Amino acid sequence: MYKKDSIDGRQKRGIYILPNLFTSASLFCGFYAVVASFQGRFLSAAIAILISFIFDGMDGRVARLTGTTSKFGVEYDSLADLVAFGVAPAILAFTWGLSGFGRLGWLAAFLYVATTALRLARFNVLSHSGVSSKSYFLGLPCPAAAAMVATTVLMAQHLGIVGPVRHFSVLIMIYVLSFLMVSSVRYPSFKDSKWLQRRPFTSMVGFILAFMILAIQPKVTLFWVSAIYVATGPVLLTIRLFSPIKSKVSTTTRSPKAVVSNREDQKDEH
């Protein structure tokens, strides 16, 4: 009896450790990316950040599937995210394209780290208070911003982009990503699986096509996927801002015949 209880206890502790192992793997990849950046192995650093992105997406799902979510795991995940998606991309961007700007370059890298920390703090506060939404993120998620930095390095090396074009592009990108992370721009979270459940066949075909495209041109595909997601927030915001104006214009520019017919319909209803 005692032996059985001890075995069950070890199993429970093992399941509890399992999601934190994925978090630790994400943290390790982020730290490795920092080391690789200082050694000038920028391609390895970018790949490490993308692998960290995968591990970060798995730890929460494993915790929910095994029923081992905890406050410790949430806090540990946030600290790991700060290293993997804050410090590591900032160091990569600085050593790869910002070091030539001097003070302006390292200030941009620091701004990226600071806004990542602020983004994570706000996310934790909203999650604990229960006011966060499952359908969207408030501000650009820091893993998506880190993926944008990493895939930019991959894309630039794929195209052979060097010189001032690369340096100024990285500088502008870091400032834009920093702003988007602490902004109130909404980004889709893709946590709602109702659409996948309603159209399983279409979803399966889409995943197969995406995998084929990724296998053919992984660097190009990952870059455009990251860039499209980063642009999704401002595009959706623009649509929401102009949609009321468009509806007002459509109601005020109706033809006189439509107005007369509408009035006649209202009379008939009375």
Q: Positions of the model-derived regions?
A:
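Topogenic membrane-insertion module of multi-pass membrane proteins
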Residues: 1-57, 236, 270
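C-terminal membrane-associated helical module and adjoining short loops/tails
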Residues: 1-7, 134-270
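Multi-pass membrane catalytic core of lipid/isoprenoid biosynthesis enzymes
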Residues: 14-23, 65-123, 152-154
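Hydrophobic alpha-helical transmembrane segments of polytopic
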Residues: 22-25, 45-52, 108-111, 115, ...
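Active-site His/Glu-centered metal-binding helix of metallohydrolases
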Residues: 28, 54, 58, 62, ...
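Helix-coil boundary and interhelical linker segments in multi-pass alpha-helical membrane proteins
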Residues: 32-47, 83, 87-109, 151-169, ...
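C-terminal ends of transmembrane helices
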Residues: 61-70, 117-132, 182-191
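Hydrophobic, well-structured mid-protein blocks that either form specific transmembrane helices
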Residues: 109-148
